[in-house]
């Protein structure tokens, strides 16, 4: 867990982070919890083992895990065991504490005060039972102390407000402590995380909780990680707090920089505390980690899971004439607020009510699903993640590029891309907003504009002032002026770095 920050001043770079993994979800459409969903998700993880990576010790992996909807019966049992009576509004959080326990008291006190300040209460802590024997030497070397925090809130606090307060409390604790070996896997009234650097067939052995007879859920997201050019860390095992991701976000540096550039415009009116928390999106770690941070922030701002995902990972809409004009206006509106987090990427996610999957517009990560007569939906990187009789299958299919699928466990229905798109386009009059408040450059007739005239002497002075070389004038500026395109060429650039150059260089050259 500590590897990444220890290599901060080495040749290792967080930009090496890449993923290519196995993922999936299983949910009961009627929100009926069962141990079958947990057991089958673990079986699915085992069958996706070939999509993950295993260390040479044979026991340490790049990471695998489960993100499950709150197992209410199990949590009441756990709380009762340690003398805690749970009310209607409660939350559990899984926390990777530093291996060195000297700082644990301070960490717990900080959680206590920040949570109390927001009108909630820490009821207690639970040491998560684990079996270290199934860990390899690499996993053991960085094994954190895994604990669960138990939190209560007033009965009249709405669950969405409860989630927001938990989110703010976690961010405040992280900012105050600035402890690199502290990681909150999940802290929610809706979901709980179990993950780590163990091989998939050992996850239920490592976490005995997962085979407890009272451990039942109606929804589970699972993930098997394969990372290249990176060192496995406990906190980078997936699923994260909302999503699990297969692929790469190839635009990650741009996405992070654009977030930093416009972070002051991303304020959430009813969460003023967040103004002091930036950067909320990780500027290092893995691309998936940063994507989860951004999704979490949008959900805290009440965007909803569909709107948030379509903002982050939109389909290819610009040149698609088959798309409804109102839907196109919806996508255009959101494109003005955030650039796509482009893959290839396949993403499974949950907010506790919806379980969903989205493919980016490249569509280079497979996602197939089946719906069975017992009202379970299974979606995964491939078919055959568990055995079933074909006669039990009601519907099956795959996601195409830019598609999104979701199951609503509250209303017991499956929503396909067209259903989700209809919800989005009918939400607001995006076409009217664009017509009234935006201007397209194509509406201007630039030929009617009078060109600026420069005399020769002034033009020469300007070129010297801005450091325009003859090469730039001929090979860059002229093609742009004549053809409206960048000039093409195959020669390398052997120009000395500006700081070492004997010539006066443009200021911009220093930032290339």
Predicted region positions:
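Conserved short alpha-helical segments that host acidic/polar catalytic motifs at enzyme active sites
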Residues: 1-512
